[in-house]
């Protein structure tokens, strides 16, 4: 039985990502918890005497125990592909991270642009039937990121762990025909950086594992304004120091700007897709000519992979060459853009007007899974 008073409780927010899931409560300034989107299953079944031991581990605990586990991500390039594991991940977020009963509070879950219909309906089914949430809503990650910048019309450049996309939005609605996606993002840049470091001839006093290279990427990588000129600079101008876990200090050079270059030149990774600047231009030119100037004038960066120093300047420089003459271009790079989507969700679910947006358990019972197609857009 649906309890209408449940809508008076702060909503639970799950921002689902290939790298991390961010969880928290409506009205707060940021997510309470950020958990790696990983589920680990025991490689070997426990003897019967230990039958009560945990059969799977989630997030950082799974990564810590990875030698004894088979690790799986429920996401593939932003889309949910492992439903049993994503359910385990959500159960962990409800019970162990937030400590709330799913049946007590409404839930807003984020979704990638162009999320397939079957995924949207399956998510509603899992939340209502398996978790018993009183109300549910699905919202586009890019739209929420734009809300976090106090805009309802603009173009969002969203780049996270597994997908980079450009999403034009008009008056709060994404324009799906003009969305452009690139399967080059954070994890690909980390892998490329590792290859470049190993090929650079450096000898490293400790093993270069993914976690270490990821840390180097986040702390030292940058986007060059003019990549060819950057390669011709003297070594002492580009070298940066990094302190390894064992205390040794290493100096790193060109790989620090060569790895993020893959966002602008995906051909480095064998992709024939257009780079970031061409994606933005392509998305905007697919929109009605009446709003193209508005979109060029309200470009918002979102996601952890847009945090590279220099990315916004490079994007602006290339867009000025691609756009028609005298087109005003503005790029907003919010400092908290790793959490922009979550913050946008927190804002909208705090509005009293959002109450009428929720898909309630009664709605689900009456109309079935297809209700999300009519109500969540």
Swiss-Prot record:
Keywords attached to this entry: Cytoplasm, Cytoskeleton
Coiled coil: none
Nucleotidyltransferase among keywords: no
InterPro entries named among the record's database cross-references: Actin, Actin/actin-like_CS, ATPase_NBD
Pfam families: Actin
GO cellular component: actin cytoskeleton; cytoplasm
Localization: Cytoplasm, Cytoskeleton
Family: Belongs to the actin family.
Protein name as catalogued: Actin-related protein T2
Lineage: Eukaryota, Metazoa, Chordata, Craniata, Vertebrata
């Amino acid at each position: 039985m649906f309890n209408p008073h449940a809508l008076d409780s702060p909503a639970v927010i799950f921002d689902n990502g290939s790298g991390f899931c961010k969880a928290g409560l409506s009205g707060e300034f940021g997510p309470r918890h950020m958990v790696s989107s990983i589920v680990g299953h025991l490689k070997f079944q426990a003897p019967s005497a230990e039958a009560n031991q945990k059969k799977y581990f989630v997030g950082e605990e799974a990564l810590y125990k990875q030698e004894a586990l088979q690790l799986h991500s429920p996401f593939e390039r932003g889309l949910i592909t492992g439903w049993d594991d994503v359910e385990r991940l959500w159960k962990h977020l409800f019970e162990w991270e937030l400590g709330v009963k799913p049946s007590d509070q409404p839930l807003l879950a984020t979704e990638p642009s162009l999320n397939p219909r079957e995924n949207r309906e399956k998510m509603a089914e899992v939340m209502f039937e398996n978790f018993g949430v009183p109300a549910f809503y699905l919202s586009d990650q890019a739209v929420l990121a734009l809300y976090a910048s106090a805009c309802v019309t603009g173009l969002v450049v969203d780049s996270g762990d597994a997908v980079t996309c450009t999403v034009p939005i008009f008056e709060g609605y994404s324009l799906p025909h003009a969305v452009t996606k690139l399967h080059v993002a954070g994890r690909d840049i980390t892998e490329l950086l590792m290859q470049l470091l190993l090929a650079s001839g450096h000898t490293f006093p400790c093993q270069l594992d993914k976690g270490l290279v990821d840390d180097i990427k986040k702390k030292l990588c940058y986007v060059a304004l003019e990549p060819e000129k950057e390669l011709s600079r003297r070594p002492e101008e580009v070298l940066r120091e990094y302190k390894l876990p064992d205390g040794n200090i290493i100096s790193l050079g060109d790989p620090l700007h060569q790895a993020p270059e893959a966002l602008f030149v995906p051909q480095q990774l064998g992709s024939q897709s257009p780079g970031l600047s061409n994606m933005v231009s392509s998305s905007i030119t697919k929109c009605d000519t009446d709003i193209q100037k508005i979109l060029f004038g309200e470009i918002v960066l979102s996601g952890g992979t847009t945090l590279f120093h220099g990315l916004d300047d490079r994007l602006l420089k290339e867009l000025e060459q691609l756009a028609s003459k005298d087109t005003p271009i503005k790029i907003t790079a919010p400092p908290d853009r790793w959490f922009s989507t979550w913050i946008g969700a927190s804002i909208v679910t705090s509005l009293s007007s959002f109450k009428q947006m929720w898909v309630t358990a009664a709605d689900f019972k009456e109309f079935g899974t297809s209700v999300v197609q009519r109500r969540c857009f």
